[in-house]
Amino acid sequence: MPLLRYIFLNFSFSLMHVYVYAQEMNEEIIVTGSLIEEVQTSNPIFSSSLEEINKRGTFRVEDYLNSLPLINPGNSALHSNFSSGTSSISIRGLGGDRSLILVDGKRLPSGSPLDGNAAQDLNQVPDVLINRIDILTGGKSTIYGSDAIGGVVNFVLDKNFIGTKISMHQGAYQHSNNSYLRNFNSNADSSVLDGINSKYSVVVGSKLNNNSHFIGYIDYKNIDSVRWDKRDIGACAFRGNSGCRLSSATYMSRIQNGSNGGYVSENGFSSSSAGFNFGAANFLQRPDKRMNSGFIYDVNLANKSKLTFSFYNLAQESNAQIGAPLLFRQKINIPCANPYITSAQFSNIGCVNTTDNINAVVSKRFVENSLNRSQFFQTSSNRGIIQYNGKTKSDWQYKIYHQNSHTSLKYKYLNDISLSKVKNALNIDSNGSCISNDLDCVAINLFTTSNNVANNVTNGITQEALDYIHLNLSIYGEISEKIFSGVIDREFKLENKLIDNYFILIGGERRENKLIKLPDSSFLNEDGAGQQVQHQNMYGKVSVNEAFLQLGLAFKNNLKIDSSVRFSDYSFGKDAFTYDLGFYYPINNIFSIKASHQKSIRVADIQELFEPEETELVYATDPCAGATPELNASQCLLTGLPNNLYQNVDDTSAQLYSKSSGNFNLSPEKAISNSISLIADLNRSRIEIDFYQINMEDQISQLSIATVIKNCVASESSNSYWCKLINRSNDGTLSTSGSYVSTPLFNLSNFDTSGLDFRLSHEIDTPIGQVLIKNITNFLIKKDFKQDADSDPINCKGFYRLGDEAGLCYQPSPKIQNVLDISLIK
């Protein structure tokens, strides 16, 4: 039985008044993978028309793309925890920052200033203007620059529309709760219909005179949330087929002083508690409000030249809910004079006299007032382009353009807990009065267990205490990009027996990227108790100057060869050279073959270069934790664990603290891509088989915690470089505030993937009409990830792996993916 079963219901309605006219404008031809209009790329390329996209009934662009076997999901509206509020895709599973998104051949800017990630935001694409989508796999850095390692997705817009189009779309998700993994259907609706989404759009196109054309559009989307607890697949966070992953931070306070203490109970402390289902309140689909608007204005000038002005705007609000606020293993000083410590708890927590203080490790899930933490994203993106293209009297074609992009983000993290105020609220005297100088301080009682808000402090946590420790945090960020680009190209005819003609293109480009991130004082002071990622002020600026050349040869026997090179000089002292070579040859009237070989790069993004030192919780395990540690006592001693704490380190979760920062010495990632395609064009059928191989080296990644500990043990010296990266807390853990493993950012990892794509298109006649069958299948042959040069390869094929060594295996890697489409076309 499948884990996920849903039906996407939609209703679309449009009114369209269209004028058809003879095309007189100098129409720009968009060729994906080539800057020369007459030269076709030799890479595997998959194109989807507007009709094919609409048939799927998908509401978002990323939903359609993620359904294709060529693409793995990236960030999307289905992410809440660690969300950036953006949507991205991952071609061949190489990550969103290695999959370049283009609109009419021009790159979109980076998506979010929150994390500085280079992955572009699909929400910026004006989907009401899409004419077709081209997906080119394999590297193409020679044509588009950095980031095109996995390939490119090019959205080609309909810029010649004339008339008025008004559209309305309504949709929802239906799901049947019948999973065998949890007895979920016994206490939930057997069928749910939710996640209602609405879309309203208007497109207006007009030929203003014989020499100009204008298109304007506005597109509004409203998407309702879907909570995980409304689905059997999300009733809890599954741990394989064995049960649920639960949090050790529960409604029962956990207060520990070394080996003393535990979960608060009526008779003192207990050693265990029912775990907290942290996933239930999370959003499976984030609520989202989005407005896209813009225009394209073309003017034909003298001498067959053309001037184009275009502007695109995105205004978006989205909310990522991630469960109740909490304290997680925070070190807090508690006076033994605290009047809410019971007599049974007093000695059990390690108190001897009321004048004593204990340095406790405190965990607590604040469920009393039913608030959940939320990440609120308010994004505004603007992209303006001015382009001038034409042709000289000597038949040289030219195109120059300037693109200016700006994205701003107002990020709010709501309903967190102030760590400093919790410390104040627990630092009280025997009368229950706050000792701190904070005049607003309200005492909090964590020594009495209750699910509900207490009417007075002796019975538990009061509303006044919850109001006092309540905390909202915020970040303001900006990303801007400027592109200056120009190319000239020409076709040359040759009169010889071998070559018919050749094409040459020469170009140059300059890109400037800038990022600003300004967290508020609560972020800067690390006051948010529920934060998994630390945020500091960040400012970074990177620019690149590039020169490139493309050649195309057309032979008299119909063989076509294309080649290109690009040199890139970056402002932080790094440079890169990329190349590609390919051919296309029609063997006969039916069969043809094409192949490509290229080197592509990805240069470190602004965060990877400029990020200040920050700490975050990552999925990892401590081999020295628990009653039966994986390592022996002498090995754990090397990692900083005293012998007296061996077998006494609390193993509470699969999350440890990692500390990292940017590295200005990072080199570009490099990938060698190869492909070969066999194509058969029959009478009513077309078959294409594509073999691909991508080998990536020098992947920018953090050292994993497991690698640091492994190398520390292998060094056999606690003073080695590796062992000094490990900083345990006084209780020996790596999951308590103040503890961490330094995991520097280096060019570490290698990635190797290969596979086969099989594409079929076939028309057949039936009694009810002509039917078109389209099928695309991906067979994954190999997908291996190496954390570093000395590590053994991790097999990703057919797996989804979690942990600090998972790397690019973090995404599911199906062995076979297939999409079948059957349409009645006549």
Model regions and ranges:
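N-terminal periplasmic "start-of-domain" segments of outer-membrane beta-barrel proteins
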Residues: 27-56
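Outer-membrane beta-barrel transmembrane strands
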Residues: 93-94, 196-208, 217-221, 276-322, ...
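Transmembrane beta-strand segments that form the barrel wall of outer-membrane beta-barrel proteins
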Residues: 164-172, 559-571, 577, 583, ...
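Gram-negative outer-membrane beta-barrel transporters
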Residues: 690-826
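Surface-exposed extracellular loop regions of Gram-negative outer-membrane beta-barrel proteins
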Residues: 450, 571, 590-669, 686, ...
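Surface-exposed beta-strand-turn/loop segments characteristic
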Residues: 44, 63-69, 73-81, 94, ...
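Structural signature of outer-membrane beta-barrel domains
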Residues: 36, 70, 108, 171-175, ...
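Cleavable N-terminal targeting peptides that direct proteins into the secretory/outer-membrane pathway or into
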Residues: 1-25
